UniProtKB/Swiss-Prot annotation:
InterPro entries, A to Z: Kynureninase, PyrdxlP-dep_Trfase, PyrdxlP-dep_Trfase_major, PyrdxlP-dep_Trfase_small
Binding site for pyridoxal 5'-phosphate: T101, T102, F129, P130, S131, D132, D210, H213, Y235, W264, T292
Gene Ontology biological-process annotations: anthranilate metabolic process; L-kynurenine catabolic process; L-tryptophan catabolic process to kynurenine; NAD biosynthetic process; quinolinate biosynthetic process
Gene giving rise to this polypeptide: kynU
Enzyme Commission no: 3.7.1.3
Organism: Exiguobacterium sibiricum (strain DSM 17290 / CCUG 55495 / CIP 109462 / JCM 13490 / 255-15)
Keywords from the named record: Hydrolase, Pyridine nucleotide biosynthesis, Pyridoxal phosphate
Protein's UniProt name: Kynureninase
EC class (word): hydrolase
Subunit structure: Homodimer.
Length: 425
């Protein structure tokens, strides 16, 4: 598609956008365009309000805040799990808001990795986020297994994408567990989770997914697909705040499985304060909690998730696709002559919520964008990631970002910066 009047198109799309009013729910910095919601979502006024309410409960109630106040702390994780559940396609009792991404991965692998006989290996991929690999290596070492031999990583054919056929071919009779991303963090490719789950189960293998780059951005059906487990962060697309508590999903057929890592908050609620040294685990995903919840880190999620309950994930996905479609059209029209390559899937069914623009000068281009008050992120060695977020970005934002990129390239403004990443990229 070619747009003869791209700015007019952006204005028209914004005028027709049913989600446009939600932009006012967020703290947007004047003169700045935020395109990094796939790394850290912005603060909403509702998230700020529920954090302040929880602080007020602490101030006014002290320890009674566990059972009283605006948002009682004792069952806050369960309340948030119920709000998370529609976003991942799980039942409320299959979801728990607890831990962090990597802690939850440790918990789930400690629970579901049961090497026996020939099945002693974990299958992952070569493009996943490094922390997942570190955790899998650690879990193997704890079992006395050498990661060099027992961690199998499916290679990418082109450095961008994974082929499900290659993953399925690697599901051999020595694999005990599979852990894969829902969406690749660099290229934004969506894996076919339903197909991979079906193929894994046909071979007697349990499978789990890292949903950090998909939860809050695309619909899921973890329960219906039969996914064994999943885990994700709540600070990217869900706007829960830096380092906020993560989430996990455990399919109901695994209820009653003793968690690999146990702690008192995994107890059945009515038994927790019996203080018995024999644990009575919760009978659902709540059993996978370990310690006391980080209440002030949970609190912003109350307001943040209320927005998703109002809007619905399908509406978020529809606008996200429209934004990224528009951005790809502009990149094709305006930036290919400068050496930019679109490194994400173009097919809407395979594309997550961000664009992956490849360029040899990516690090310097990101710094030049920041000098123009555009916030992207950089992934070595050559990727500029841009994530127009449905709840707070506009089509005109997308137009402005591409226009600024064109100016940067026309005037070679990037040359004043070093082509190396910053400490936090």
């Amino acid at each position: 598609m070619t747009l003869t009047a791209p700015r007019k198109h952006a204005i028209e799309q914004d005028q027709q956008d049913a989600l446009a009013p939600y932009r006012n729910e967020f703290y947007l910095q004047e003169g700045s365009i935020y395109m990094d919601g796939n790394s850290l979502g912005l603060l909403s006024k509702r998230a700020e309000a529920t954090l302040l309410e929880s602080l007020a409960d602490w101030r006014e109630l002290g320890i009674d805040g566990w059972m009283k106040g605006r948002h009682p702390w004792f069952d806050l994780s369960e309340k948030l799990a119920a709000l998370n559940a529609p976003l991942v396609g799980g039942r409320a009792d299959e979801v728990m808001v607890t831990g962090s991404t990597t802690v939850n991965l440790h918990q789930l692998v400690a629970t579901f990795f049961a090497p026996s006989g020939r099945r002693t290996k974990i299958l992952a991929d070569s493009l996943t986020f490094p922390s997942d690999i570190y955790a899998l290596q650690s879990q193997l070492r704890l079992r006395g297994l050498d990661p060099a031999e027992h961690l199998v990583q499916v290679e990418s054919r082109d450095g961008r994408f994974l082929d499900e056929a290659d993953i399925i071919a690697a599901m051999t009779d020595d694999i005990a567990l599979i852990v894969l991303p829902t969406v690749l963090y660099r290229s934004g490719q969506i894996l076919d989770m339903e197909r991979l789950t079906r193929e894994a189960h046909a071979r007697g293998i349990l499978i789990g997914f890292d949903g950090c780059h998909s939860v809050g951005a695309i619909p899921h059906a973890f329960h219906d697909w039969g996914v064994d487990f999943a885990y994700w962060c709540n600070y990217k697309h869900l706007n829960g705040g830096p380092g906020t508590v993560g989430g996990l999903f455990v399919h109901e057929r695994h209820f009653g499985t003793l968690p690999g890592l146990t702690g008192w908050f995994g107890s059945r609620k009515d038994k927790q304060f019996d203080m018995n040294h024999t644990m009575t685990p919760a009978e659902n995903a709540a059993a996978f909690q370990i310690g006391t919840p980080h209440v002030l880190s949970l609190a912003p999620q109350i307001g943040a998730l209320e927005l998703f309950a109002e809007v619905g994930i399908d509406a978020v996905r529809a606008k996200s696709l429209a934004l990224t479609d528009y951005m790809m059209t502009l990149v094709d029209q305006e930036l290919t002559a400068y050496g930019f390559v679109i490194g994400n899937p173009r097919d809407a069914k395979r594309r997550g919520a961000h664009l992956s623009l490849e360029h040899p000068e990516a690090a310097r281009i990101c710094k030049a964008l920041k000098a123009h008050q555009v916030i992207p992120d950089f992934r070595a060695p050559n990727i500029v990631r841009l994530a127009p977020v449905a709840l707070y970005n506009s089509f005109e934002d997308v137009y402005e970002v591409v226009s600024i990129l064109k100016t940067i390239m026309d005037e070679k403004q990037y040359e004043q910066f070093k082509n190396e990443r910053e400490v936090v990229a």
